[in-house]
Amino acid sequence: MYVSDLALTDFRSYADLVIGLEPGITAFVGPNGQGKTNLVEAIGYLGTFSSHRVSGDAALVRWGAERAVVRAKVVRRARPTLVELEIVAGRANRARVDRSPVSRVREAAGIARSVIFAPEDLALVKGDPDGRRRFLDDLLVQLSPRLAGVRSEYERVLRQRTALLKSAGPARRRSGDGEPAALRTLDVWDGHLARAGAELVAARVRLVQDLRPHVGATYEQVSAAQSEARISYRASVEEARPDDAPTEVVESVETELTRADLVEARLLEAMARLRTREIERGVSLVGPHRDDLVLTLADMPAKGYASHGESWSYALALRLASYALLRDDGEAGGGGEPVLVLDDVFAELDARRRTRLASIVASAEQVLVTAAVAEDVPEELEGARMDVMGGEVLRVR
């Protein structure tokens, strides 16, 4: 799969831009702040409906404009598909596929698949769990677009339930011995949260199982080290179980977590047991919003133990594993390879990792590279070149 045409209207710094692309390698070269990353960010947004740089959509709309539009022609197995996404800050996005509106935006997800490598990826290893949860969810949306709706529903219910918990404490104190209406309503929201949360947890755990062998293999490719990189899923619903619950082997617990019905029952049980603490603190203490992707290196936590170089190798392995999974899924389903985006990542790597990464990705169907100077693009990735300056994109090779 590759993107043959990209058009941006009021997206970031671009008021109106149309560029043609081709299979193979294309480097966007120019000083920082000139709009290189904005180009590849738009391609990434079409795949996941989220930016790898910011958590909200408001920053994507050019200053002074009401909305931004991203259009891309995607070629899969020689068949072009036009995808268009309209971004309006504070409102639901709207999408078109081949110029026809779709009833749900998520129907356009997964058409323009991509994997973005960026300097921010180091936070996948060294940062908070939120970034690792987002890594899993963004990949899930590309593999199974309907899960975008599940994630949105879970986030909506979580906000409602958390607001209810915050109000339940004062309501309980005012009511004395009586049960406030807020607590009776809480049972309903518990059910909604458990149902959506269980589906999300089960999907994440299956994804981790599929990613695991790819992460181990790609870490070895990038680092040439003997230390084994292994990922696993830490579920808050398991940690919330009573202390006297039987201890089970990891594989057994993981298998159970792939069954949404079992996860739903455990979430309901945990919420009932933790209700008093949740009301006191005004937060939801269990659910996929409190889970984590655990990264280990030679059986030690990568966060805190891995060196800077090892952390970079791990971050690259996670992205390369994502690419391998999307590629295999695309080949089976007729979608082809995802677009590979390397956003200013080579400037962050030592010479050995630069060479290894470049040699691994060079054969991909389409590779888009951004760099501040041409010297940052490895020789293995020689191809088309576009200079980016002041919001203008000029092809020079």
From Swiss-Prot:
Cross-referenced InterPro entries: DNA-binding_RecF, DNA-binding_RecF_CS, P-loop_NTPase, RecF/RecN/SMC_N, RecF_2
Name of the molecule in the record: DNA replication and repair protein RecF
GO cellular component, one term: cytoplasm
Function: The RecF protein is involved in DNA metabolism; it is required for DNA replication and normal SOS inducibility. RecF binds preferentially to single-stranded, linear DNA. It also seems to bind ATP.
Subcellular compartments: Cytoplasm
Species in which this protein is naturally found: Beutenbergia cavernae (strain ATCC BAA-8 / DSM 12333 / CCUG 43141 / JCM 11478 / NBRC 16432 / NCIMB 13614 / HKI 0122)
GO molecular function, one term: single-stranded DNA binding
NCBIfam families: recf
